[in-house]
Amino acid sequence: MSIFISPSNNTGWGLRAPSKMYGGAXQRSTQHPVRVRGHFRAPWGALKGRVRSRTTVDDVIDQVVADARNYTPAAAPVSTVDAVIDSVVSDARRYARAKSRRRRIARRHRSTTAMRAARALLRRARRTGRRAMLRAARRAASGASAGRTRRRAATAAATAISSMSRPRRGNVYWVRDXATGVRVPVRTRPPRT
């Protein structure tokens, strides 16, 4: 004859697993209470869960959360004196940077004595070229009845001078003049000897 014992924690009938008696504890205590019912269980055929209607408290909480999410801190009032000082300092720094950059560029492209001599020669040529052009123009204006050859020579001289004064791209070769012994800048490449 078998004896049926009903345990108090509703795990089933009999003493199949004594360890399951009080939720794993050997004996019931305040530190390890037995959980009888965990959650609300609706009867079969009822709705899946309780539908709770929204309350005013829910709306207030939602509004507070939305405000916190969209919060942007107000900009601190900017002092006009500070702004003026900052702008003056930044302008001074920019000016100093530009000045040092100009100095660096000037140092990088410092001209040699040969380059300075070439520039002086070109300046002199331009000056004399302008004078010659003016002279040729005066001659052409005064001697309108002058011969065709003179007019042609004047225009040729004027074009040569203008082409000489116009800055041209290309190489400049320094050649020693046989008569004077001075180095002269020339555009055409000297023959190799």
Curated annotation (Swiss-Prot):
Miscellaneous remark of the record: All late proteins expressed from the major late promoter are produced by alternative splicing and alternative polyadenylation of the same gene giving rise to non-overlapping ORFs. A leader sequence is present in the N-terminus of all these mRNAs and is recognized by the viral shutoff protein to provide expression although conventional translation via ribosome scanning from the cap has been shut off in the host cell.
Phosphothreonine sites (modified residues): T55
Modified residues (N-acetylserine): S2
Record protein name field: Pre-histone-like nucleoprotein
Gene this chain is encoded by: L2
Protein task: Plays a role in the inhibition of host immune response within the nucleus. Interacts with cellular nucleosomes and immobilizes the host immune danger signal HMGB1 on chromatin. In turn, prevents HMGB1 release out of the cell and thus decreases inflammation. Also plays a role in the wrapping and condensation of the viral DNA. May also promote viral genome import into the nucleus.
Keyword Transit peptide in annotation: no
Cited HAMAP family: ADV_PVII
Keywords: Acetylation, DNA-binding, Host nucleus, Host-virus interaction, Late protein, Phosphoprotein, Viral penetration into host nucleus, Virion, Virus entry into host cell
